[in-house]
């Protein structure tokens, strides 16, 4: 089971947006408690991203850049 910290690190290490990211403490992760953590919503630099699990891999999609 992924912890919040390991999940945030995974997001940081795999995201393809700006690599000059904030420290881990400034990355806000919210897990939607669906079955087996299928959906993960997090914000980075005023952007909202949705992580969806797809065949045991997480892919990320930009939802909003407001």
Curated annotation (Swiss-Prot):
Keywords: Eukaryotic host gene expression shutoff by virus, Eukaryotic host translation shutoff by virus, G0/G1 host cell cycle checkpoint dysregulation by virus, Host endoplasmic reticulum, Host gene expression shutoff by virus, Host-virus interaction, Modulation of host cell cycle by virus
Keyword NADP set for record: no
Compartments where located: Host endoplasmic reticulum
Region (Involved in the inhibition of host protein synthesis): 13-34
Assigned GO CC terms: host cell endoplasmic reticulum
Principal localisation: host cell
Highest taxon of source: Viruses
One GO-annotated biological process of the protein: symbiont-mediated perturbation of host cell cycle G0/G1 transition checkpoint
Purpose of the protein: Inhibits host protein translation, probably through the EIF2AK2/EIF2S1 signaling pathway. Promotes cell retention in the G0/G1 phase.
Family listed: Belongs to the asfivirus E66L family.
Protein name: Host translation inhibitor E66L
């Amino acid at each position: 089971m992924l912890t919040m910290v390991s999940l945030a690190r995974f997001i940081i290490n795999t995201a393809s947006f700006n690599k000059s990211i904030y420290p881990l403490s400034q990355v806000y992760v919210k897990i939607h408690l669906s079955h087996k953590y299928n959906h993960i919503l997090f914000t980075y630099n005023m952007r909202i991203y949705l992580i969806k699990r797809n065949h045991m891999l997480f892919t990320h999609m930009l939802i909003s850049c407001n």
